[in-house]
A protein has these predicted regions:
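Beta-sheet-dominated interaction scaffolds and their linkers
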Residues: 1-41, 110
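Short strand-edge motifs at loop-to-beta-strand transitions and within beta-strands
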Residues: 21, 71-77
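Short, solvent-exposed loop/turn segments enriched in Ser/Thr/Gly
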Residues: 28-35, 82-90
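Buried hydrophobic-core signal for structured, non-transmembrane domains
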Residues: 34-40, 77, 90-94, 106
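Short, acidic/polar linear motifs in exposed loop/turn regions
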Residues: 41-44, 83, 97
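Surface-exposed binding patches on compact interaction domains or structured appendages
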Residues: 43-72
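Terminal connector regions
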Residues: 85-111
Length: 111
């Protein structure tokens, strides 16, 4: 409908210092957490609608509040290995930024 397309029209821009973070090598039984920082560089509020992960081993915590222009939001990504081995996980962030969905990646080796 018309309303949806108008909502779609409210876009902002974001900057992410790094979209790809390595957790390095770690004991597979130890939970690992890293932070991705999304900075709202546009002129509108940034709203994160949804964050999807490629498996249950990866969870993401973040503030559900809209992010004001020039402010940032931290996405705290926690990885709990199900077994030892290398991993490469994608996190999809759906938001009202031009580049949505944003793909974030974590890699590493659980030993």
């Amino acid at each position: 409908g018309k309303a949806a397309s108008e909502r779609e029209g409210i876009r902002t821009k974001i900057n992410i210092k790094s979209t790809d973070l390595s957790l390095g090598a770690f004991d597979w039984q130890q939970e690992q957490t890293v932070e991705f920082i999304l900075e709202n560089t546009g002129e509108r509020l940034l709203v994160i609608n949804d964050v999807l992960t490629s498996c249950d081993c990866t969870t993401v915590g973040y503030s559900k509040e809209p992010v004001h222009p020039k402010d940032s939001v931290a996405l705290s990504v926690t990885y709990m290995a199900e077994q030892p081995g290398r991993f490469d996980k994608i996190i999809k962030v759906y938001c009202n930024a031009d580049s949505s969905p944003i793909l974030l990646r974590i890699t590493g080796e659980a030993k």
